[in-house]
Amino acid sequence: MSKKSGLSFLWLSAVAFVIDLLTKYIVVQKFDLYESVNVLPVFNLTYVRNYGAAFSFLADHSGWQQYFFILLALAISGMLVYFLAKNNAEQKIQNSAYALIIGGALANMVDRAYNGFVVDFFDFYWDIYHYPVFNIADIAICIGAGLLVLDAFKSEKKKVQDKQVEKCGQK
């Protein structure tokens, strides 16, 4: 009997993908560009267009970056799907991380391919200092990256514990 692979976590990619594109659609339908609605004293919903990547990286270039980021999202997503296929379903943290990154990357890729930019709308600030505006896909990618870091520390701790047990057994 074959074991279930990490591909069973792709439902999480689909959830991140759909929620991201749905929220972007709502923002585009309900907000004018740069319109901002105050939600909390440190948080606005603000419709902006990001022509670059995270923190508007490469946004001021002539347009080649759109194709670069589309290809990058496809390559990374393909690689992570391959990793999911190789992983055992019991590797829950790593599989969840990969799935969230895939969902976020593909959602931003579809947005970029369809619109030529990515819709961002979460705007956190303190006084005059604003954190770069972001979206659900960015959150999924960041949570996925954080889970990978957590998994790496967890794996390293297990290796150290296994070595200690091995040393005790040799005495």
Swiss-Prot record:
<protein>
    <recommendedName>
        <fullName>Lipoprotein signal peptidase</fullName>
        <ecNumber>3.4.23.36</ecNumber>
    </recommendedName>
</protein>
<keyword id="KW-0472">Membrane</keyword>
<keyword id="KW-1133">Transmembrane helix</keyword>
<feature type="transmembrane region" description="Helical">
    <location>
        <begin position="133"/>
        <end position="153"/>
    </location>
</feature>
<dbReference type="Pfam" id="PF01252">
    <property type="entry name" value="Peptidase_A8"/>
</dbReference>
<keyword id="KW-0812">Transmembrane</keyword>
<feature type="transmembrane region" description="Helical">
    <location>
        <begin position="8"/>
        <end position="28"/>
    </location>
</feature>
<feature type="transmembrane region" description="Helical">
    <location>
        <begin position="64"/>
        <end position="84"/>
    </location>
</feature>
<keyword id="KW-0064">Aspartyl protease</keyword>
<dbReference type="GO" id="GO:0004175">
    <property type="term" value="F:endopeptidase activity"/>
</dbReference>
<comment type="function">
    <text>This protein specifically catalyzes the removal of signal peptides from prolipoproteins.</text>
</comment>
<comment type="pathway">
    <text>Protein modification; lipoprotein biosynthesis (signal peptide cleavage).</text>
</comment>
<dbReference type="InterPro" id="IPR036259">
    <property type="entry name" value="MFS_trans_sf"/>
</dbReference>
<dbReference type="InterPro" id="IPR001872">
    <property type="entry name" value="Peptidase_A8"/>
</dbReference>
<keyword id="KW-0378">Hydrolase</keyword>
<keyword id="KW-1003">Cell membrane</keyword>
<comment type="similarity">
    <text>Belongs to the peptidase A8 family.</text>
</comment>
<keyword id="KW-0645">Protease</keyword>
<feature type="transmembrane region" description="Helical">
    <location>
        <begin position="99"/>
        <end position="119"/>
    </location>
</feature>
<dbReference type="GO" id="GO:0005886">
    <property type="term" value="C:plasma membrane"/>
</dbReference>
<feature type="active site">
    <location>
        <position position="138"/>
    </location>
</feature>
<keyword id="KW-0997">Cell inner membrane</keyword>
<feature type="active site">
    <location>
        <position position="120"/>
    </location>
</feature>
<dbReference type="GO" id="GO:0004190">
    <property type="term" value="F:aspartic-type endopeptidase activity"/>
</dbReference>
<dbReference type="GO" id="GO:0006508">
    <property type="term" value="P:proteolysis"/>
</dbReference>
